[in-house]
Amino acid sequence: MDQATLFSTYPEIGTKKDYQGFRAVADHANLVRYGVDCYAYALLAAGQIDLVIEAGLNAYDIQAPIAVVEAAGGLVTNWQGGPAHLGGQVVACASQDLLNEVLPLLAPYAVAAK
């Protein structure tokens, strides 16, 4: 994860607990960038970045990005490792290995899925 590039819409995502979860991962990433919204998922699918972390999403915010990322071989889950299609807290990763590193960091801040 220390070589990962992480994107998010903005650093103060969702609630205070969401922000703390984001920081738990961001503090381990090589590079963190903000402000690209759904374009981050396109960058992930294209192999340009490694990780996207968001919170407070609606179903319509994430369903199309899930299709794009998964078609490119990436993974999209909620912060508990379950389905993300209803929105809420979402993590998208380029690989299963990276997801396996990220989920334990997010777990203390994960809320029940929608």
What are these model-derived regions, one by one?
Residues M1-K114:
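An extended, acidic
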